[in-house]
Amino acid sequence: MKTFSAKAHEVKRDWLLVDADGKILGRFATQIASRLRGKHKPEYTPHTDTGDYIVIINASKIKVTGNKFEDKMYHHHTGYVGNLKSIAFKDLQAKKPEEIINKVVKGMLPKGPLGRDMFRKMKVFAGSEHTHGAQQPQVLDI
């Protein structure tokens, strides 16, 4: 008997709708990353993108434990000398709440072309409205 290896064009991908309201950021992101990779499917193949499309709503209502709401900082470098920029979690949540989930989930996916393809299948929205109604996403409770 041969080992099964899924082909990317043969994989059936579902559209899932996930509500982030009141969820804890890290625990929520691990579930999303696992679904994006396709690890919940029996035909999971590590070198092939077998994951589902995921639409996340209410990103602005995500929670963190402990003092991270006040203390957690996100850093990025502009590329110029001495330009390391920092922003606090609470400020980033007020300005761009989608970016928080994007950063966390992207860090949990494989690095390289395969991980970038997986990341593109995640759509994050700050409010409860989304633009993917035509895909008829199924509600997933995490």
From Swiss-Prot:
This is Large ribosomal subunit protein uL13. PANTHER family: LARGE RIBOSOMAL SUBUNIT PROTEIN UL13M, RIBOSOMAL PROTEIN L13. Belongs to the universal ribosomal protein uL13 family. This protein is one of the early assembly proteins of the 50S ribosomal subunit, although it is not seen to bind rRNA by itself. It is important during the early stages of 50S assembly. GO terms for cellular component: cytosolic large ribosomal subunit. The keyword Nucleotidyltransferase does not apply. GO terms for molecular function: mRNA binding; structural constituent of ribosome. GO terms for biological process: negative regulation of translation; translation. Keywords: Ribonucleoprotein, Ribosomal protein. Part of the 50S ribosomal subunit. PROSITE patterns: RIBOSOMAL_L13. NCBIfam families: rplM_bact. InterPro entries: Ribosomal_uL13, Ribosomal_uL13_bac-type, Ribosomal_uL13_CS, Ribosomal_uL13_sf. It comes from the Bacteria.
